[in-house]
Amino acid sequence: MSSIKLIVGLANPGAEYAQTRHNAGAWYVDLLAERHNQSLKEESKFFGYTARLNLAGQDIRLLVPATFMNLSGKAVAAMASFYRILPEEILVAHDELDILPGMAKLKLGGGNGGHNGLKDIQNKLGNNPNFYRLRIGIGHPGDKSKVTGFVLGKPPASEQTLIDNAIDESIRCTEVLLNEGMTKAMNRLHAFKASA
């Protein structure tokens, strides 16, 4: 069983970004809150939108930073500091170029894969990379020069369905992570592949 006290969904703020691939982490947190009859409310001292859930018997805070993606660490560090939450008690959900739509993967620690949100969180947590990541696959445009436009673009309906299905399975696997631990959650989530 894993002790997670804070689940963060990365995003850019504002209506123009709400449906873009870069906001996949926030889609996951929003759905997680909704499934537990909660809604995120703005809390300025944490520079984001927050909610509180009881998940698998654990008291868990949800956070979607209201800052731009590359400043996500400000919100995460503020909440972690206030509630005395350690990096290894944090799960950060984010979009992942290196995973296809319809799939998601869990990992603990590691690099940031060039993801500016992860980079800033690691820096603001005292350069500590040892937090959990939920990597939600969005696919890759195939060319490095196209990445910015791709992550800030909206997926076509067929891809959106795949991403939504992977998020749905990720929510089920979050419960597995909390109840039965990382290995069981990884085994289940990594075997999942949504079909169109």
UniProtKB/Swiss-Prot annotation:
Keyword Cytoplasm applies = yes
The identity of this protein, by name, is Peptidyl-tRNA hydrolase
Function text: Hydrolyzes ribosome-free peptidyl-tRNAs (with 1 or more amino acids incorporated), which drop off the ribosome during protein synthesis, or as a result of ribosome stalling. Catalyzes the release of premature peptidyl moieties from peptidyl-tRNA molecules trapped in stalled 50S ribosomal subunits, and thus maintains levels of free tRNAs and 50S ribosomes.
Q: Offer an example of a GO molecular function term for this protein.
A: peptidyl-tRNA hydrolase activity
Record keywords = Cytoplasm, Hydrolase, RNA-binding, tRNA-binding
Describe the reaction catalysed, as an equation: an N-acyl-L-alpha-aminoacyl-tRNA + H2O = an N-acyl-L-amino acid + a tRNA + H(+)
Its annotated compartments are:
Cytoplasm
Organism the protein comes from: Yersinia pseudotuberculosis serotype O:1b (strain IP 31758)
